[in-house]
C-alpha cells in the first residue's frame, strides 16, 4: 500500500484525491496547506490528516509519496524539501516555470534517490498511444506538419481567483504555459523534440494579468517536420472547443480532437483502421473537457498517471513522465516566450 500526501488544497487537489481513492494499492493519508482551515476542510471531505506544518508533513512516517498542487512557480521549494525527507514526488503540470528550475528538481531528487514524476494525463489515453504507434511505424511517410490547436476560454473571474494567476513569477506564462501545455506535451511525446521556434503573443480579452491569453508559434522539429501551436484562453464558445493535434504526411493524416479521431486515414490501410475509426472516432457534438470550465475534467486520467508511477516504483523502472520528460515542454515554452519577447526572432530550444 502506497500512502499519499497532497501539498495544496485547491481545485486540482480534489482530482488527486479522487484518483488516489480509485487505486486499490493507494491511500490518501495527509493534506498540507498553509491555511489550517483549508486543510481541515479538505481532510474532512477526503478523510485524511490535516497539516499546516510542512516539516511535520514531509517527515510523517505515514506518507510515502507527495503530490504537488501548489502554484507552478512554487514547485521547486516544496519538492526539494520533500526529496531531502526521502519522499517520492508526483508534480502537477507544469513541473516548474523554467527549465533551470526543473533541472534543480531533477538533481535534488536524484541525489536523494527518490522518484520525480510529472502529470500529463493525455499521454495515457488509448488514442494517444495509437497515434504514437502509427508515427513510430512510419505510417505517415514523410511527416510534413505537426500542429496543436487549443482555442479555449477562461473568464476574468478565473484569473482573479488567485493572486498568483496571470503572473510570470508563479504562473510562468498564460494560455500556452497553463492551458495548452497538456497538448504541447502530447505533441512532443508523439513527434519528438523541436529544434527552433518563432512566436508571437498577445493579451486580448483579460485585464490585470501580466501574461498572454493568445499565443502562436511556428515550429521546426528535429526530424525535419514543421508545425504550428495556437493556444488561447480568449476564444469564447458556448460549450468549448476541443484541443486538437493534427499530424499530416505524404502517406497519412490524423486529426485528433481531445481523445477522439476526427480523421484517421492512411494511404495503406491496415485491418485495424476501420475498428479504430469506429471505436475512437469523434462523435458529433462532443466538446473539449476543460475547454471552458477548468473543473470539467475526468480524474480517471490522473488515476492512470498515478498508477504508472506506482508500477515504476514496484518494478524499479522510469515512469512514463519522469523529470526529464516533464522538462521538454518547459524548455520549448521558454523558447517560445523568448521569441515572442524578441519580436518573433528564431530561438533554439
Residue ranges, per PLM feature:
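N-terminal Rossmann-like dinucleotide-binding module
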Residues: 1-46
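Beta-loop-alpha module in the N-terminal Rossmann-like domain of NAD(P)-dependent dehydrogenases
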Residues: 48-108, 301
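Hydrophobic residues in well-ordered beta-strands that form the structural core
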Residues: 52, 68, 91, 116-118, ...
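Rossmann-fold dehydrogenase core element
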Residues: 103-122, 141-148
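C-terminal capping/lid region of NAD(P)-dependent oxidoreductase domains
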Residues: 114, 141-145, 338-349
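Predominantly a Rossmann-like dinucleotide-binding segment in NAD(P)-dependent oxidoreductases
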Residues: 122-209, 343
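C-terminal glycine/acidic-rich active-site capping loop/insertion
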Residues: 221, 244-324, 349
Amino acid at each position: 500500500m502506497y500512502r499519499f500526501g497532497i501539498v495544496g488544497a485547491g481545485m486540482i487537489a480534489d482530482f488527486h484525491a479522487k484518483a488516489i481513492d480509485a487505486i486499490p494499492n493507494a491511500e490518501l493519508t495527509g493534506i498540507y496547506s498553509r491555511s489550517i482551515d483549508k486543510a481541515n476542510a479538505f481532510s474532512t471531505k477526503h478523510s485524511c490528516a490535516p497539516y499546516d506544518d510542512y516539516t511535520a508533513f514531509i517527515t510523517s512516517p505515514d506518507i510515502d509519496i507527495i503530490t504537488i498542487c501548489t502554484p507552478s512557480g512554487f514547485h521547486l521549494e516544496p519538492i526539494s524539501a520533500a526529496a531531502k525527507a526521502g519522499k517520492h514526488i508526483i508534480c502537477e503540470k507544469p513541473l516548474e516555470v523554467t527549465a533551470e528550475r526543473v533541472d534543480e528538481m531533477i538533481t535534488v531528487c536524484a541525489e536523494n534517490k527518490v522518484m520525480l514524476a510529472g502529470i500529463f494525463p493525455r499521454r495515457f489515453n488509448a488514442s494517444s498511444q495509437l497515434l504514437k504507434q502509427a508515427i513510430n511505424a512510419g505510417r505517415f511517410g514523410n511527416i510534413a506538419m505537426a500542429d496543436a490547436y487549443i482555442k479555449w476560454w477562461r473568464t476574468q473571474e478565473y484569473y482573479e481567483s488567485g493572486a498568483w494567476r496571470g503572473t510570470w513569477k508563479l504562473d510562468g506564462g498564460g494560455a500556452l504555459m497553463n492551458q495548452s501545455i497538456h497538448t504541447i506535451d502530447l505533441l512532443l511525446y508523439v513527434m519528438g523534440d523541436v529544434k527552433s521556434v518563432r512566436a508571437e503573443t498577445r493579451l486580448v480579452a483579460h485585464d490585470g494579468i501580466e501574461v498572454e491569453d493568445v499565443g502562436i508559434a511556428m515550429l521546426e522539429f528535429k526530424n525535419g517536420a514543421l508545425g504550428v501551436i495556437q493556444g488561447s484562453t480568449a476564444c469564447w464558445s458556448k460549450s468549448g472547443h476541443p484541443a486538437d493535434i493534427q499530424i499530416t504526411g505524404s502517406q497519412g493524416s490524423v486529426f485528433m480532437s481531445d481523445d477522439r479521431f476526427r480523421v484517421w486515414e492512411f494511404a495503406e490501410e491496415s485491418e485495424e483502421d476501420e475498428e479504430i475509426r469506429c471505436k475512437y472516432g469523434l462523435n458529433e457534438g462532443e466538446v473539449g473537457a476543460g475547454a471552458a470550465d477548468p473543473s470539467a475534467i475526468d480524474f480517471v486520467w490522473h488515476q492512470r498517471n498515478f498508477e504508472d508511477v506506482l508500477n515504476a516504483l514496484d518494478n524499479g523502472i522510469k515512469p512514463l513522465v519522469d523529470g526529464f520528460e516533464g522538462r521538454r515542454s518547459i524548455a520549448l515554452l521558454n523558447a517560445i516566450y523568448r521569441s515572442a519577447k524578441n519580436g518573433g526572432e528564431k530561438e533554439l530550444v
